[in-house]
């Protein structure tokens, strides 16, 4: 992830690949480095920004919203929170209470016990089914670095790797590309599993070079800064081939790209 085995094993590998349910990599959208993008998570999308990629909330937007963006030639990423329970989502009752941990600093959100793969997998499968059925091209799974936070659970880096790989496989089984959100320490292990990266504030913390493995693999890095002005990070972003812009924290329509 060969003697008589040189003949038998390749055939067996092809047969198993055909039964796995995972879409071939070449059939998925693969965003390349440097693509401009819009990231809007506050309510339904405003389609007026002229960029090739939109990252929008999977619950708040409709089939018609995604179809309109496609008619305009856009690719569309489905934002889904996979690391925290949200009390404002229609499937909030699907999460067993023992899986809900500490509040994460955002209103109505609590960390999830991501060790419970068998419980969380069908919930996330239904969410990614929604993304696929609405016509999205990719998924942005949020909060995939709980092991570095006070979640209320003794999460380890190994727990996070297992969960993140499960999330990536759920997306790929549905023909969706998937992005690694932040989680810089695990890029070396997770690079083969993810099709692009989404990063917040790597310039503020002088960490943008850590995303270079994605760029070197021909995979886009969609990057935002909140507090830093473009004058402080765009030169490095262009050098590193990041898709960078400044946004306000509420992630509305406003953007200031490099």
Model-flagged regions — what are they?
Residues 1, 21-22:
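Nucleic acid-interaction modules of nuclear/chromatin regulatory proteins and viral regulators
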Residues 22-258:
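Glycan-processing catalytic domains of CAZymes
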Residues 1-8:
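Bacterial N-terminal signal peptides that target proteins for export
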Residues 15-18:
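C-terminal motif of bacterial Sec signal peptides marking the signal peptidase cleavage site
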Residues 12-13, 251:
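Residue-level signal for mature regions of secreted extracellular proteins and peptides
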Residues 10-12, 171:
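A residue-level detector for conformationally permissive "hinge/kink" positions
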């Amino acid at each position: 992830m060969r003697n008589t085995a040189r003949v038998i094993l390749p055939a067996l590998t092809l047969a198993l690949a055909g039964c796995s349910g995972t879409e071939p990599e070449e059939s998925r959208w693969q965003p390349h480095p440097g693509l401009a993008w819009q990231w809007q998570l506050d309510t339904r999308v405003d389609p007026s920004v002229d960029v090739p990629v939109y990252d929008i909330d999977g619950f708040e937007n409709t089939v018609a919203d995604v179809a309109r963006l496609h008619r305009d030639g856009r690719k569309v990423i489905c934002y889904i929170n996979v690391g925290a329970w949200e009390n404002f989502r229609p499937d909030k009752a699907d999460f067993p209470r023992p899986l809900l941990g500490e509040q994460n600093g955002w209103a109505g959100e609590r960390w999830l016990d991501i060790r419970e793969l068998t419980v969380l997998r069908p919930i996330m499968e239904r969410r990614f089914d929604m993304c696929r059925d609405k016509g999205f091209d990719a998924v942005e799974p949020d909060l995939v670095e709980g092991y570095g936070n006070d979640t209320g659970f003794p999460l380890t880096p190994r727990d996070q790797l297992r969960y993140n790989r499960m999330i990536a496989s759920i997306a790929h089984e549905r023909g969706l590309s998937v992005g690694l959100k932040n989680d810089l320490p695990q890029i070396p292990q997770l690079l083969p599993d993810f099709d692009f990266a989404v990063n917040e504030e790597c310039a503020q913390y002088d960490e943008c070079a850590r995303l270079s493995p994605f760029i070197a693999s021909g995979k886009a890095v969609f990057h935002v800064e909140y507090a830093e002005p473009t004058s402080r990070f765009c030169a490095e972003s262009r050098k590193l081939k990041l898709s960078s812009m400044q946004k306000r924290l509420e992630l509305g329509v406003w953007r200031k790209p490099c």
